[in-house]
Curated annotation (Swiss-Prot):
This is Uncharacterized protein DDB_G0274485. Residues 1-18 form the signal peptide. It is found in: Secreted. It comes from the Eukaryota. The lineage of its organism: Eukaryota, Amoebozoa, Evosea, Eumycetozoa, Dictyostelia. It comes from Dictyostelium discoideum. Residues 103-116 have a biased composition (Low complexity).
Length: 185
């Protein structure tokens, strides 16, 4: 019975020593919070309106297609992965590099944040229009810190930027421009 326990113990020790310490295993990264937000761009030019040639009224039903109005905006987003404790997985501490003070206790071995951007535009004229949206996606190198042997391996993670929104002026009596007398209504 004692021999079996010794054999099992030897097997477990051998297994723990066989763990690769220089591999950049994506499973060692935990997903942090994802932040995405969009901005609104500047408003474009005002549309124009047509008026009745009989009484000069500004009838919304007689709005004509004025200049196209457009705007663009950008947003940002990113995430902050946290490296798990490699010491629990048989990793050896890399003593060849200076250790970050926050990592002395082998907790949260590396923290990284990234940000992306996106843009969009919207255009419209007359009484109705539309708002455009867009999003950006890019990659950035993520290093697991300088605490363990795998610190010289960079992982490329993707993050998504927030959507940008464009807007335009809708034709109202307050913001439209008089584009002249319209006949043939």
């Amino acid at each position: 019975m004692l021999l079996k326990l010794i054999l099992i113990l030897c097997f477990l020790v051998t297994l723990s020593l066989s763990v690769k310490v220089d591999s950049a295993d994506p499973a060692l990264f935990t997903q942090g919070p994802t932040i995405a937000s969009g901005g609104t761009g500047n408003t474009g030019a005002n549309p124009c309106y047509g008026h009745d040639d009989e009484d000069g009224s500004k009838d919304p039903a007689m709005f004509t297609q004025g200049p196209v109005s457009s705007g663009s905006g950008s947003g940002s987003g990113g995430y902050c992965p946290h490296h798990k404790n490699r010491a629990q997985e048989g990793g050896k501490k890399d003593t060849t590099k200076e250790q970050p003070k926050e990592n002395n206790n082998n907790k949260n071995l590396g923290r990284h944040s990234s940000s992306g951007s996106g843009s969009g535009s919207g255009s419209g004229c007359g009484v109705t229009g539309d708002t455009g949206t867009g999003s950006g996606r890019t990659t950035a190198p993520v290093n697991d810190g300088v605490t363990y042997k795998s610190s010289n391996v960079k992982e490329t993670e993707q993050y998504r930027g927030g959507a940008g929104r464009g807007k335009h002026n809708q034709a109202t009596e307050e913001n439209v421009q008089d584009c002249g007398e319209i006949t043939g209504w």
